Regions:
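N-terminal basic/disordered segments at the start of proteins
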Residues: 7-23
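Nucleotide and nucleotide-moiety/phosphate-recognizing core
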Residues: 79-87, 175, 183, 220
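Charged C-terminal helix
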Residues: 45, 219-259
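Conserved phosphate/ATP/ADP-binding segment of small-molecule kinases
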Residues: 110-184
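Phosphate-handling active-site elements
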Residues: 22-26, 185, 211-225
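Conserved N-terminal subdomain of the carbohydrate kinase-like
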Residues: 19-102, 106
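Short pre-catalytic strand/loop immediately N-terminal to key active-site residues, enriched for Gly-Thr
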Residues: 1-6, 184-198
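Short, small-residue alpha-helix embedded
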Residues: 15, 135-136, 194-218
Length: 259
């Protein structure tokens, strides 16, 4: 994943989410991103050689139960990650196809879209596109539940074992649709009027990966992850001048009696 010096998205959100779920977080940085709650100012991709070295450093030393993949902005990054996934064969691979930041800044180069489809999607146990990302992947407008179902099936046909199309961007009750390769599952949610939505996609995909690593089945893993993000938004502290982060440790703070 990419970095976030403001701590709300990318590798920072991933690590917080894994830790909140009782997992030990490891991270491989794919891009150094200058961003905060107000937007992305710029980024620099890490070289494929250094990405490969980071992955080797992790897998050669520590047993990995699940992998979550976030920002992979150029074809070279995607290819080296795919090669390493084939080499190490982790049990679960969750891919969040990060294309556009909450602020609207594009994080996936246009020339990388086809590489993402051809090289990374077939290695994904779960893919978690939001509506704009699902539209890019399928080339079709999504305006209804039926469109979400069609998109999930179409993306699964590209190779992903399961696809969770997130409806929070447009669907009235924030319902998400999961296609597991055979059946559809629906996850209704309450829409919260909040600006604390920075890193929600990162946090959801990492929560799914955490839950799978902890032994949950896919349907339960998605439901628990959705609840985790909802509670994180509902109890978020007002941080920053723009779209602030969710409260990743709300449940732990509550148990510890921290206000």
């Amino acid at each position: 994943a990419g970095t976030d010096p403001s701590g709300g998205a990318g590798a920072a959100a991933d690590c917080k989410t894994f830790c909140a779920h009782g997992c030990f977080a490891l991270n491989v940085i794919t891009a150094v991103v200058s961003q905060n709650t107000q937007g992305v100012r710029g980024y620099m991709d890490v070289t494929p050689e250094l990405i490969a070295s980071q992955i080797d450093a992790v897998f050669e030393d520590i047993d990995v139960d699940a992998v979550k993949i976030g920002m992979v902005s150029v074809p070279e990054t995607i290819r080296v990650i795919a090669d390493k996934l084939k080499q190490y064969r982790p049990a679960f691979v969750v891919v969040d196809p990060v294309m556009v930041a909450t602020s609207g800044h594009r994080l996936l180069a246009p020339e990388a879209e086809q590489t993402l489809k051809d090289v990374l999607l077939p290695l994904a146990d779960v893919l978690t596109p939001n509506l704009p990302e699902a539209e890019v992947l399928t080339g079709k407008k999504i305006e209804s539940f039926e469109d979400m179902e069609d998109a999930a099936k179409a993306i699964a046909a590209m190779g992903a074992k399961a696809v969770l199309v997130k409806g929070g961007h447009r669907i009235a009750d924030a319902t998400d649709v999961l296609f597991d390769g055979k059946d559809f599952h629906y996850y209704k949610g309450k829409r919260i009027e909040s600006t604390s939505t920075h890193g929600t996609g990162c946090s959801l995909s990492s929560a799914i990966a955490s839950n799978l690593a902890n032994g949950m089945n896919l349907s339960d893993a998605v439901q628990a992850a959705k609840t985790y993000v909802f509670e994180g938004i509902a109890h978020a502290e007002p941080i920053g001048k723009g779209h602030g982060p969710i409260h990743h440790f709300y449940e732990l703070y509550k148990k510890a009696g921290v206000q």
